[in-house]
Amino acid sequence: MATQMVNQSTGNSLFCTSTYSNISLDNDMYGLHDLSKADMAAPRLIMLANVALTGELSSGCCDYTPEGERQMAELTTVNDNSFSDSEGDRLEDSPSMDIQSHNFIMEMEPAECSKEGTSENDGTLLSNTLEVEVQKDKRTPSPTDDKYKCVKSKPFRCKPCQYKAESEEEFVHHIKIHSAKIYVDNDSNKKAQGNEADSSISEESDVSKGPIQCDRCGYNTNRFDHYLAHLKHHNKAGENERVYKCTICTYTTVSEYHWKKHLRNHYPRILYTCSQCSYFSDRKNNYIQHIRTHTGERPYQCILCPYSSSQKTHLTRHMRTHSGEKPFKCEQCSYVASNQHEVTRHARQVHNGPKPLTCPHCDYKTADRSNFKKHVELHVNPRQFLCPVCDYAASKKCNLQYHIKSRHSGCTNITMDVSKVKLRTKKGDIGVADVDANKQTENGNIIDKSVEETVKAEKRESCGKAKKSIVNLVDGQVAKKRRLSSTQKKIKTSDARPEKILDKSRKSSCVKRKSDLLENSNDTQTSTV
């Protein structure tokens, strides 16, 4: 806990011994009760302020010299990453900073002071981002002035936004918008020098967000679709629409939401960093969605097909393929699509949209920032996807997935999802694959023929057995006759001839008997008559 003390020295003091012998700046005045030394040493950068009082007194008691100076040192942001929109709003609403407790800096009522020498406590300039300047008043105040009050017109100035305030109260209220924490440190000379160097580098590195610039308000971007969306705001609200500008860089926008979202890039609250790659984000939901790309988790399942996704937006976009909905339309033609990405790609390919992003290593140009980052990563780290089983390294994730499915399909320790990867045959392996296929087909044909022959033989045997059983039931000798040889058949035919003659004689005798019986019956009838 740091406190700026103004102590009385022998014969050399800015304030009299009876009134201002020992003055201490309260930490609650700057809202420092929640800070500790650990916060100062932490990598999270915070706001520093060094308050100093300097001045000179003439040889006459209570006389104010023209060289008298009262200076309040600069309030400087040292890359405060802990700022957020919600915290800034909370600070504006809470009257935690009481500026009335240090009004003695601006109003001093000298009493009995010594006549000897001068005393000077030099303030230290921390940086040149946010600055409070109290200009020297070269005129000699007359005794008619109210208690020798130093009256200046708008001595407080904020460098980033050029804001000027007449009173310290207005300026402190303005400062609360820029920072979340203000710290009073009386030993920050060395830190100030390093911070000045860092701030100069950051100012030199500030570049435009994109080459596409709006002529009406100065809005700039590197994406043509964002520029077209920006023009729609002008068409709706007119040219006098409010423009939100960033006080740290040259970013401008007409949307308050995008402006607050941009401020998080300068003042992130908490950074979520991925342990497997270089990804980081200040939003937990985005971080969770990114982790799913490593684990392969897909909690969002389509109810109409086996499709699954790690993000809800992807599932919503997929459902449009079932419903046939295409709400996104190209502004230059009648092309419609189910998502904005396809419309943007259509505009670049068909209508030759601008491609402001150029690769510094080759002639690659694009308007898509994500594709641009992926392309540059191929130059910086060409093989960043490593196989967990072998020494294989790939430049793209899809290549690694194909490698795992084709070479390590039996490994169970791999967490990467390769279910949607389709294996393909290379050009050099086509001939070998054809020979193997021909051999397999020939072997299959031979096997099929042998199976067919065995089936036919079994069918023949079963049919023969069935026929034999039926013939034996009807006539037991039919089967024997079929088995007789030719000689046996001749013998049987010779033996069968006399049998046929006997049968004929028997038939003739029977006929004679019948005729005799008929004649006898006729005779009896005539006799009776």
From Swiss-Prot:
Single GO MF annotation: zinc ion binding
Main location: nucleus
Zinc among keywords: yes
GO biological process per UniProt: negative regulation of DNA-templated transcription; positive regulation of neuron differentiation; positive regulation of transcription by RNA polymerase II; regulation of alternative mRNA splicing, via spliceosome; regulation of osteoblast differentiation; response to hypoxia
InterPro entries associated with the record: Zinc_finger/UBP_domain (IPR050688), Znf_C2H2_sf (IPR036236), Znf_C2H2_type (IPR013087)
UniProt cross-references to SMART domains, sorted A to Z: ZnF_C2H2 (SM00355)
A GO-annotated cellular component: cytoplasm
Subcellular location: Nucleus; Cytoplasm
Gene3D superfamilies: Classic Zinc Finger (3.30.160.60)
Renumbered residue ranges of the record's region Disordered: 188-210, 484-529
Pfam families: zf-C2H2, zf-C2H2_REST, zf-H2C2_5
Keywords: Cytoplasm, Developmental protein, Metal-binding, Nucleus, Repeat, Repressor, Transcription, Transcription regulation, Zinc, Zinc-finger
The UniProt record lists the keyword Zinc-finger: yes
Record field: compositional bias (Basic and acidic residues): 492-506
Zinc finger (C2H2-type): 156-178, 212-234, 244-266, 272-294, 300-322, 328-351, 357-379, 385-408
Polar residues bias spans: 518-529
Domain remark text: The C2H2-type zinc finger 5 is required for nuclear localization.
Protein role: Transcriptional repressor which binds neuron-restrictive silencer element (NRSE) and represses neuronal gene transcription in non-neuronal cells. Plays a role in the early development of the nervous system and is required for proper patterning of the neuroectoderm during gastrulation. This involves the correct speciation of the neuroepithelial domain and adequate development of the non-neural ectoderm.
Protein name, per record: RE1-silencing transcription factor B
Organism listed in the record: Xenopus laevis
Gene name in the database record: rest-b
